[in-house]
Curated annotation (Swiss-Prot):
The modification Phosphoserine is found at residues 83, 157, 176, 263. It catalyses: (2R)-2-phosphoglycerate = phosphoenolpyruvate + H2O. The keyword Aminoacyl-tRNA synthetase does not apply. It comes from the Eukaryota. Mammalian enolase is composed of 3 isozyme subunits, alpha, beta and gamma, which can form homodimers or heterodimers which are cell-type and development-specific. In vitro, interacts with several glycolytic enzymes including PKM, PGM, CKM and ALDO. Also binds PLG and troponin, in vitro. Interacts with PNKD. The lineage of its organism: Eukaryota, Metazoa, Chordata, Craniata, Vertebrata. This is Beta-enolase. The modification N-acetylalanine is found at residue 2. GO terms for biological process: canonical glycolysis; glycolytic process. The gene is Eno3. Pfam families: Enolase_C, Enolase_N. Substrate binds at residues 158, 167, 293, 318, 370-373, 394. Brain (at protein level). The alpha/alpha homodimer is expressed in embryo and in most adult tissues. The alpha/beta heterodimer and the beta/beta homodimer are found in striated muscle, and the alpha/gamma heterodimer and the gamma/gamma homodimer in neurons. In striated muscle, the fiber-type order of ENO3 expression is IIB > IIX > IIA > I.
Length: 434
Protein backbone atom coordinates (compact mmCIF):
# COMPACT_ATOMS: atom_id res chain seq x y z
CA UNK A 1 0.00 0.00 0.00
CA UNK A 2 1.45 3.31 -1.07
CA UNK A 3 1.76 6.40 1.09
CA UNK A 4 -0.60 9.22 0.16
CA UNK A 5 0.68 12.08 2.27
CA UNK A 6 3.51 12.74 4.72
CA UNK A 7 3.33 15.80 6.95
CA UNK A 8 5.64 16.79 9.81
CA UNK A 9 5.19 19.41 12.53
CA UNK A 10 7.04 20.74 15.57
CA UNK A 11 5.49 19.70 18.91
CA UNK A 12 6.80 19.89 22.50
CA UNK A 13 8.27 17.03 24.49
CA UNK A 14 7.85 16.36 28.21
CA UNK A 15 10.53 18.91 29.09
CA UNK A 16 9.05 21.73 27.02
CA UNK A 17 11.59 21.30 24.22
CA UNK A 18 10.52 21.06 20.58
CA UNK A 19 10.53 17.68 18.84
CA UNK A 20 9.34 16.21 15.55
CA UNK A 21 5.93 14.64 14.94
CA UNK A 22 5.01 12.97 11.65
CA UNK A 23 1.58 12.20 10.20
CA UNK A 24 1.57 9.59 7.45
CA UNK A 25 -1.59 8.97 5.44
CA UNK A 26 -2.50 5.80 3.53
CA UNK A 27 -5.85 4.41 2.37
CA UNK A 28 -6.08 2.81 5.84
CA UNK A 29 -5.99 6.14 7.69
CA UNK A 30 -3.56 8.48 9.44
CA UNK A 31 -0.56 7.17 11.36
CA UNK A 32 1.21 9.46 13.78
CA UNK A 33 4.63 9.18 15.39
CA UNK A 34 6.62 11.50 17.66
CA UNK A 35 10.36 11.42 18.29
CA UNK A 36 11.95 11.50 21.79
CA UNK A 37 15.23 13.20 22.79
CA UNK A 38 17.84 12.60 25.50
CA UNK A 39 19.54 14.76 28.17
CA UNK A 40 22.73 12.78 28.67
CA UNK A 41 23.67 11.90 25.11
CA UNK A 42 26.52 9.70 23.95
CA UNK A 43 29.01 11.38 21.62
CA UNK A 44 28.60 8.55 19.10
CA UNK A 45 24.84 8.96 18.66
CA UNK A 46 23.18 9.77 15.33
CA UNK A 47 22.69 13.51 14.98
CA UNK A 48 19.55 15.13 16.34
CA UNK A 49 19.07 18.21 14.17
CA UNK A 50 18.28 21.42 16.09
CA UNK A 51 17.83 24.85 14.50
CA UNK A 52 20.39 26.68 16.65
CA UNK A 53 18.38 29.92 16.50
CA UNK A 54 18.88 31.25 20.05
CA UNK A 55 15.97 33.67 19.65
CA UNK A 56 13.57 30.74 19.33
CA UNK A 57 13.19 27.98 21.92
CA UNK A 58 16.75 28.79 23.11
CA UNK A 59 18.13 27.30 19.91
CA UNK A 60 16.30 23.99 20.29
CA UNK A 61 13.71 24.40 17.55
CA UNK A 62 13.33 21.59 15.00
CA UNK A 63 11.91 23.51 12.05
CA UNK A 64 14.83 22.43 9.84
CA UNK A 65 14.14 18.75 10.49
CA UNK A 66 10.42 19.34 9.90
CA UNK A 67 11.19 21.12 6.63
CA UNK A 68 13.48 18.28 5.52
CA UNK A 69 10.50 15.93 5.86
CA UNK A 70 7.93 18.22 4.27
CA UNK A 71 10.12 19.42 1.39
CA UNK A 72 12.51 16.54 0.69
CA UNK A 73 12.02 13.18 2.44
CA UNK A 74 8.22 13.12 2.16
CA UNK A 75 7.97 14.06 -1.55
CA UNK A 76 10.83 11.66 -2.43
CA UNK A 77 9.11 8.77 -0.64
CA UNK A 78 5.75 9.51 -2.28
CA UNK A 79 7.42 9.62 -5.68
CA UNK A 80 9.21 6.32 -5.01
CA UNK A 81 5.84 4.63 -4.29
CA UNK A 82 7.32 2.26 -1.72
CA UNK A 83 4.89 0.12 0.28
CA UNK A 84 4.57 0.84 4.01
CA UNK A 85 5.04 -2.87 4.75
CA UNK A 86 8.55 -2.72 3.25
CA UNK A 87 10.13 -1.15 6.33
CA UNK A 88 13.67 -2.04 5.35
CA UNK A 89 13.34 -0.59 1.83
CA UNK A 90 11.85 2.65 3.14
CA UNK A 91 14.54 3.09 5.80
CA UNK A 92 17.33 2.22 3.38
CA UNK A 93 15.99 4.75 0.87
CA UNK A 94 15.96 7.55 3.49
CA UNK A 95 19.42 6.67 4.82
CA UNK A 96 20.90 6.66 1.31
CA UNK A 97 19.17 9.93 0.47
CA UNK A 98 20.74 11.44 3.60
CA UNK A 99 24.11 10.01 2.65
CA UNK A 100 25.98 10.80 5.88
CA UNK A 101 27.35 8.41 8.49
CA UNK A 102 25.36 9.93 11.37
CA UNK A 103 22.23 11.20 9.55
CA UNK A 104 23.41 14.80 9.90
CA UNK A 105 21.97 16.00 6.58
CA UNK A 106 18.28 15.52 7.43
CA UNK A 107 18.69 14.74 11.15
CA UNK A 108 18.06 11.40 12.85
CA UNK A 109 14.94 13.03 14.34
CA UNK A 110 13.53 13.58 10.82
CA UNK A 111 14.37 10.10 9.50
CA UNK A 112 13.17 8.35 12.66
CA UNK A 113 9.86 10.24 12.71
CA UNK A 114 9.03 8.97 9.24
CA UNK A 115 10.39 5.48 10.01
CA UNK A 116 8.16 5.11 13.10
CA UNK A 117 5.07 6.34 11.24
CA UNK A 118 5.77 3.92 8.37
CA UNK A 119 6.02 1.04 10.85
CA UNK A 120 2.63 1.89 12.36
CA UNK A 121 1.11 2.17 8.87
CA UNK A 122 2.68 -1.17 7.89
CA UNK A 123 0.99 -2.92 10.81
CA UNK A 124 -2.38 -1.46 9.81
CA UNK A 125 -1.81 -2.47 6.19
CA UNK A 126 -1.22 -6.07 7.29
CA UNK A 127 -4.17 -5.87 9.68
CA UNK A 128 -2.08 -6.91 12.68
CA UNK A 129 -1.16 -5.17 15.96
CA UNK A 130 2.05 -3.11 15.86
CA UNK A 131 3.89 -5.53 18.19
CA UNK A 132 3.11 -8.45 15.84
CA UNK A 133 4.32 -6.50 12.79
CA UNK A 134 7.58 -5.65 14.60
CA UNK A 135 8.00 -9.32 15.58
CA UNK A 136 7.56 -10.26 11.90
CA UNK A 137 10.13 -7.67 10.81
CA UNK A 138 12.56 -9.14 13.35
CA UNK A 139 11.73 -12.73 12.40
CA UNK A 140 10.39 -13.55 15.88
CA UNK A 141 7.62 -16.15 16.12
CA UNK A 142 7.21 -15.41 19.85
CA UNK A 143 6.11 -12.40 21.85
CA UNK A 144 7.36 -11.61 25.37
CA UNK A 145 6.13 -9.03 27.88
CA UNK A 146 9.04 -7.27 29.57
CA UNK A 147 9.98 -6.70 33.17
CA UNK A 148 9.64 -2.93 33.75
CA UNK A 149 12.69 -1.17 35.24
CA UNK A 150 11.20 1.81 37.08
CA UNK A 151 13.57 4.73 37.57
CA UNK A 152 12.42 5.85 41.02
CA UNK A 153 15.41 7.84 42.31
CA UNK A 154 17.03 10.36 39.96
CA UNK A 155 20.49 11.90 40.12
CA UNK A 156 23.15 12.85 37.59
CA UNK A 157 22.11 15.04 34.65
CA UNK A 158 18.45 14.31 35.37
CA UNK A 159 18.23 16.02 38.73
CA UNK A 160 19.19 19.12 40.66
CA UNK A 161 20.64 17.18 43.61
CA UNK A 162 24.27 16.26 44.28
CA UNK A 163 23.84 12.57 43.47
CA UNK A 164 26.35 11.59 40.76
CA UNK A 165 24.69 8.41 39.54
CA UNK A 166 21.77 9.06 37.24
CA UNK A 167 19.15 6.38 37.88
CA UNK A 168 18.23 3.94 40.62
CA UNK A 169 15.63 1.47 39.38
CA UNK A 170 13.38 -1.22 40.78
CA UNK A 171 12.61 -4.36 38.74
CA UNK A 172 9.67 -6.52 39.94
CA UNK A 173 11.13 -9.77 38.56
CA UNK A 174 9.09 -11.92 40.95
CA UNK A 175 5.75 -10.78 39.51
CA UNK A 176 3.70 -13.36 37.59
CA UNK A 177 2.48 -10.95 34.91
CA UNK A 178 3.21 -7.49 33.56
CA UNK A 179 0.06 -6.19 35.25
CA UNK A 180 1.25 -7.48 38.61
CA UNK A 181 4.70 -5.99 37.99
CA UNK A 182 3.03 -2.60 37.49
CA UNK A 183 1.14 -2.91 40.76
CA UNK A 184 4.24 -3.96 42.70
CA UNK A 185 6.23 -1.13 41.12
CA UNK A 186 3.58 1.46 41.95
CA UNK A 187 3.27 0.22 45.55
CA UNK A 188 7.03 0.34 46.12
CA UNK A 189 7.06 3.82 44.53
CA UNK A 190 4.44 5.08 47.00
CA UNK A 191 6.26 3.52 49.95
CA UNK A 192 9.48 5.14 48.73
CA UNK A 193 7.72 8.51 48.67
CA UNK A 194 6.74 8.00 52.30
CA UNK A 195 10.26 6.94 53.30
CA UNK A 196 11.83 9.98 51.58
CA UNK A 197 9.26 12.38 53.02
CA UNK A 198 9.84 11.09 56.56
CA UNK A 199 13.61 11.37 56.25
CA UNK A 200 14.14 14.50 54.14
CA UNK A 201 10.88 16.47 54.29
CA UNK A 202 8.05 17.07 51.85
CA UNK A 203 9.97 19.03 49.23
CA UNK A 204 12.29 16.04 48.76
CA UNK A 205 9.43 14.21 47.03
CA UNK A 206 9.32 16.50 43.98
CA UNK A 207 9.87 14.43 40.85
CA UNK A 208 12.55 14.60 38.15
CA UNK A 209 12.31 14.40 34.35
CA UNK A 210 11.42 10.72 34.42
CA UNK A 211 9.06 10.74 37.39
CA UNK A 212 11.55 9.56 39.99
CA UNK A 213 12.31 11.36 43.24
CA UNK A 214 15.41 13.50 43.55
CA UNK A 215 16.12 13.93 47.28
CA UNK A 216 19.21 16.00 48.02
CA UNK A 217 21.57 13.20 48.92
CA UNK A 218 25.21 12.88 47.95
CA UNK A 219 26.07 9.28 48.79
CA UNK A 220 25.00 6.77 46.16
CA UNK A 221 24.63 3.98 48.70
CA UNK A 222 22.10 6.15 50.52
CA UNK A 223 19.87 5.94 47.42
CA UNK A 224 20.24 2.15 47.50
CA UNK A 225 19.42 2.14 51.22
CA UNK A 226 16.21 4.11 50.53
CA UNK A 227 15.19 1.57 47.87
CA UNK A 228 15.92 -1.36 50.16
CA UNK A 229 13.78 0.22 52.89
CA UNK A 230 10.88 0.93 50.52
CA UNK A 231 10.97 -2.58 49.04
CA UNK A 232 10.84 -4.05 52.59
CA UNK A 233 8.06 -1.68 53.63
CA UNK A 234 5.97 -2.64 50.60
CA UNK A 235 6.48 -6.31 51.47
CA UNK A 236 8.34 -7.43 48.33
CA UNK A 237 11.94 -8.23 49.33
CA UNK A 238 11.71 -11.53 47.44
CA UNK A 239 10.12 -10.06 44.30
CA UNK A 240 11.95 -6.80 43.57
CA UNK A 241 15.58 -6.30 42.57
CA UNK A 242 17.58 -3.15 41.83
CA UNK A 243 19.12 -1.73 38.67
CA UNK A 244 21.31 1.34 38.22
CA UNK A 245 22.22 3.67 35.39
CA UNK A 246 25.41 5.40 36.46
CA UNK A 247 25.95 7.41 33.23
CA UNK A 248 29.61 7.63 34.22
CA UNK A 249 30.63 9.55 31.07
CA UNK A 250 28.91 12.54 32.68
CA UNK A 251 31.48 12.64 35.50
CA UNK A 252 34.61 11.36 33.76
CA UNK A 253 37.47 13.84 34.19
CA UNK A 254 40.89 13.29 32.58
CA UNK A 255 40.94 9.53 32.98
CA UNK A 256 39.34 9.56 36.45
CA UNK A 257 35.85 9.81 37.94
CA UNK A 258 34.36 12.59 40.08
CA UNK A 259 31.51 11.35 42.28
CA UNK A 260 30.79 14.92 43.42
CA UNK A 261 30.81 16.47 39.93
CA UNK A 262 28.09 19.02 40.64
CA UNK A 263 30.32 20.82 43.15
CA UNK A 264 33.30 23.03 42.18
CA UNK A 265 35.99 20.83 40.64
CA UNK A 266 38.69 19.40 42.91
CA UNK A 267 41.01 16.86 41.21
CA UNK A 268 42.06 15.59 44.65
CA UNK A 269 38.77 13.76 45.03
CA UNK A 270 38.77 12.10 41.56
CA UNK A 271 39.02 8.30 41.69
CA UNK A 272 40.30 5.68 39.24
CA UNK A 273 38.05 3.36 37.24
CA UNK A 274 39.37 0.46 39.29
CA UNK A 275 38.35 2.18 42.52
CA UNK A 276 34.90 2.94 41.09
CA UNK A 277 34.60 -0.74 40.15
CA UNK A 278 35.29 -1.69 43.78
CA UNK A 279 32.45 0.60 44.84
CA UNK A 280 30.07 -1.23 42.46
CA UNK A 281 31.18 -4.62 43.78
CA UNK A 282 30.38 -3.33 47.24
CA UNK A 283 26.86 -2.34 46.05
CA UNK A 284 26.34 -5.79 44.49
CA UNK A 285 27.38 -7.45 47.75
CA UNK A 286 25.17 -5.35 50.02
CA UNK A 287 22.06 -4.76 47.90
CA UNK A 288 20.06 -6.80 45.37
CA UNK A 289 21.71 -4.96 42.45
CA UNK A 290 21.34 -7.09 39.30
CA UNK A 291 22.03 -4.56 36.53
CA UNK A 292 24.42 -1.62 36.12
CA UNK A 293 24.34 0.60 33.03
CA UNK A 294 27.25 2.73 31.82
CA UNK A 295 29.44 2.07 34.90
CA UNK A 296 32.40 3.71 33.13
CA UNK A 297 33.12 6.32 30.45
CA UNK A 298 32.19 5.58 26.83
CA UNK A 299 35.87 5.34 25.82
CA UNK A 300 37.29 3.70 28.95
CA UNK A 301 37.20 0.26 27.29
CA UNK A 302 39.86 -1.41 29.45
CA UNK A 303 37.99 -0.69 32.68
CA UNK A 304 34.72 -2.05 31.23
CA UNK A 305 36.45 -5.27 30.18
CA UNK A 306 38.24 -5.92 33.47
CA UNK A 307 35.09 -5.14 35.47
CA UNK A 308 32.83 -7.42 33.41
CA UNK A 309 35.19 -10.36 33.88
CA UNK A 310 34.85 -10.03 37.66
CA UNK A 311 31.05 -9.84 38.08
CA UNK A 312 28.12 -12.02 37.05
CA UNK A 313 25.38 -9.38 36.93
CA UNK A 314 24.03 -7.57 33.86
CA UNK A 315 26.32 -4.79 32.61
CA UNK A 316 24.50 -2.54 30.15
CA UNK A 317 26.09 -0.42 27.44
CA UNK A 318 24.30 2.82 26.54
CA UNK A 319 26.74 5.69 25.90
CA UNK A 320 29.25 2.91 25.20
CA UNK A 321 27.24 1.31 22.39
CA UNK A 322 24.66 4.00 21.38
CA UNK A 323 22.52 1.35 19.59
CA UNK A 324 25.18 1.44 16.85
CA UNK A 325 26.18 -1.88 15.19
CA UNK A 326 29.84 -0.80 14.88
CA UNK A 327 30.11 0.09 18.57
CA UNK A 328 28.22 -3.09 19.55
CA UNK A 329 30.63 -5.24 17.50
CA UNK A 330 33.55 -3.50 19.24
CA UNK A 331 32.04 -4.14 22.68
CA UNK A 332 31.41 -7.80 21.82
CA UNK A 333 35.00 -8.24 20.68
CA UNK A 334 36.39 -6.54 23.81
CA UNK A 335 33.93 -8.33 26.12
CA UNK A 336 33.08 -4.93 27.58
CA UNK A 337 29.43 -5.51 28.52
CA UNK A 338 26.69 -8.13 28.20
CA UNK A 339 23.55 -6.11 27.51
CA UNK A 340 22.54 -3.46 24.98
CA UNK A 341 20.41 -0.46 25.85
CA UNK A 342 18.21 0.01 22.78
CA UNK A 343 17.13 3.58 22.03
CA UNK A 344 15.54 4.06 18.62
CA UNK A 345 16.63 7.68 18.37
CA UNK A 346 20.31 6.90 18.98
CA UNK A 347 20.50 5.11 15.64
CA UNK A 348 17.57 6.80 13.90
CA UNK A 349 15.46 4.16 12.13
CA UNK A 350 13.29 1.13 12.94
CA UNK A 351 15.29 -1.21 10.67
CA UNK A 352 18.64 -0.31 12.23
CA UNK A 353 17.14 -0.64 15.74
CA UNK A 354 16.00 -4.19 14.93
CA UNK A 355 19.42 -5.00 13.44
CA UNK A 356 21.21 -3.67 16.55
CA UNK A 357 18.94 -5.75 18.79
CA UNK A 358 19.51 -8.93 16.78
CA UNK A 359 23.27 -8.37 16.67
CA UNK A 360 23.33 -8.09 20.47
CA UNK A 361 21.06 -11.10 21.00
CA UNK A 362 23.04 -13.27 18.55
CA UNK A 363 26.12 -12.64 20.70
CA UNK A 364 24.38 -13.83 23.84
CA UNK A 365 23.69 -10.35 25.20
CA UNK A 366 20.56 -9.16 26.91
CA UNK A 367 18.72 -6.14 25.44
CA UNK A 368 16.85 -3.47 27.38
CA UNK A 369 14.53 -1.18 25.41
CA UNK A 370 14.60 2.41 26.65
CA UNK A 371 12.78 5.73 26.52
CA UNK A 372 14.63 9.08 26.57
CA UNK A 373 14.35 11.72 29.30
CA UNK A 374 12.58 14.04 26.83
CA UNK A 375 9.54 11.93 25.91
CA UNK A 376 6.14 12.30 24.25
CA UNK A 377 2.82 10.48 24.50
CA UNK A 378 3.94 8.14 21.68
CA UNK A 379 3.86 4.47 22.75
CA UNK A 380 5.90 2.84 19.95
CA UNK A 381 8.56 1.41 22.28
CA UNK A 382 5.92 -0.58 24.22
CA UNK A 383 5.08 -2.53 21.06
CA UNK A 384 8.76 -2.67 20.11
CA UNK A 385 9.84 -4.39 23.33
CA UNK A 386 7.13 -7.06 23.00
CA UNK A 387 7.91 -7.72 19.32
CA UNK A 388 11.67 -7.90 19.88
CA UNK A 389 11.22 -10.21 22.92
CA UNK A 390 13.95 -8.43 24.86
CA UNK A 391 12.32 -9.08 28.23
CA UNK A 392 13.12 -5.69 29.79
CA UNK A 393 12.14 -2.05 29.32
CA UNK A 394 12.95 1.14 31.16
CA UNK A 395 10.59 4.01 30.59
CA UNK A 396 10.63 5.93 33.86
CA UNK A 397 8.80 5.80 37.16
CA UNK A 398 5.10 4.92 37.46
CA UNK A 399 4.48 8.68 37.39
CA UNK A 400 4.07 11.34 34.62
CA UNK A 401 1.80 10.56 31.70
CA UNK A 402 4.53 10.38 29.06
CA UNK A 403 6.00 7.47 31.07
CA UNK A 404 2.70 5.77 31.92
CA UNK A 405 1.63 5.95 28.26
CA UNK A 406 4.15 3.17 27.54
CA UNK A 407 3.41 1.11 30.64
CA UNK A 408 -0.35 1.34 30.10
CA UNK A 409 0.08 0.25 26.48
CA UNK A 410 2.01 -2.80 27.72
CA UNK A 411 -0.88 -3.68 30.04
CA UNK A 412 -3.27 -3.46 27.06
CA UNK A 413 -0.99 -5.69 24.98
CA UNK A 414 -0.85 -8.29 27.77
CA UNK A 415 -4.64 -8.17 28.02
CA UNK A 416 -5.02 -8.60 24.24
CA UNK A 417 -2.71 -11.64 24.24
CA UNK A 418 -4.80 -13.25 26.99
CA UNK A 419 -3.57 -16.70 28.02
CA UNK A 420 -0.89 -16.54 25.31
CA UNK A 421 0.86 -13.72 27.17
CA UNK A 422 4.34 -14.66 28.37
CA UNK A 423 5.96 -12.44 31.03
CA UNK A 424 9.77 -12.46 31.17
CA UNK A 425 9.98 -12.37 34.98
CA UNK A 426 13.25 -13.67 36.41
CA UNK A 427 14.42 -14.63 32.91
CA UNK A 428 14.52 -10.96 31.86
CA UNK A 429 18.16 -11.22 30.76
CA UNK A 430 17.43 -13.99 28.28
CA UNK A 431 13.66 -14.49 27.96
CA UNK A 432 14.00 -16.81 24.96
CA UNK A 433 15.97 -19.39 26.97
CA UNK A 434 13.85 -22.48 27.34
Amino acid sequence: MAMQKIFAREILDSRGNPTVEVDLHTAKGRFRAAVPSGASTGIYEALELRDGDKARYLGKGVLKAVEHINKTLGPALLEKKLSVVDQEKVDKFMIELDGTENKSKFGANAILGVSLAVCKAGAAEKGVPLYRHIADLAGNPDLVLPVPAFNVINGGSHAGNKLAMQEFMILPVGASSFKEAMRIGAEVYHHLKGVIKAKYGKDATNVGDEGGFAPNILENNEALELLKTAIQAAGYPDKVVIGMDVAASEFYRNGKYDLDFKSPDDPARHISGEKLGELYKNFIQNYPVVSIEDPFDQDDWATWTSFLSGVDIQIVGDDLTVTNPKRIAQAVEKKACNCLLLKVNQIGSVTESIQACKLAQSNGWGVMVSHRSGETEDTFIADLVVGLCTGQIKTGAPCRSERLAKYNQLMRIEEALGDKAVFAGRKFRNPKAK
